[in-house]
């Protein structure tokens, strides 16, 4: 009987903090997204954006995954796409609920020209974090590559609702509308 209490104690000692950290993380994200919507200017919005990216890019319980994500992101920025793709895939296998693993792999798939696979990964991101303005922006870019301009506009309009000051959304929507209008002529 004492062993049961010991195991329960150890479980709550180690996993209780992780559960609490996850709740705190969600509350913090909710507050940041509210601030982002209400931000008064671009520089304030950008500071909030950086805080959100920091939370997204940090795995809530596994520092090694956070480091792996950072390493694979560095590889991706160096053009080592296949290598970064494999690391992002491993991260997803280990932590399928972590939206940023999916988001980074969607990005590398986009860079590899594998647009439909990128869209599939973006869908996975949005299942886990519907406010992921990075994934929505990426979705817009993929739709542009696929010449699905109406869908791209919808993606950027969704971004604008979440992050009104994000310049890519503000710039892309009128450009895409003009492109659609010009193609209709």
Question: Whereabouts are the PLM-identified features?
Answer:
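Boundary/linker segments of alpha-helical solenoid repeat arrays
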Residues: 43-46, 60, 133-134, 163-175, ...
């Amino acid at each position: 009987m004492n062993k049961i209490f010991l195991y329960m104690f150890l479980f709550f000692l180690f996993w209780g903090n992780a559960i609490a950290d996850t709740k705190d993380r969600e509350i913090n994200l909710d507050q940041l997204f509210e601030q982002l919507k209400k931000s008064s200017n671009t520089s304030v919005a950008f500071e909030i954006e950086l805080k959100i990216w920091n939370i997204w890019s940090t795995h809530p319980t596994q520092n090694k995954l956070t480091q792996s994500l950072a390493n694979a992101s560095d590889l991706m920025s160096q053009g080592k796409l296949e290598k970064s793709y494999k690391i992002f895939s491993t991260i997803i296998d280990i932590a399928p609920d972590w939206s940023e693993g999916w988001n980074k792999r969607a990005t590398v798939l986009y860079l590899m020209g594998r647009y439909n696979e990128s869209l599939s990964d973006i869908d996975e991101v949005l299942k886990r974090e519907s406010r992921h303005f990075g994934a929505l922006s990426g979705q817009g870019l993929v739709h542009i590559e696929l010449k699905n301009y109406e869908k791209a506009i919808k993606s950027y309009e969704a971004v604008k609702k979440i992050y009104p000051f994000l310049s890519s959304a503000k710039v892309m929507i009128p450009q895409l509308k003009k492109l659609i209008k010009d193609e209709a002529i």
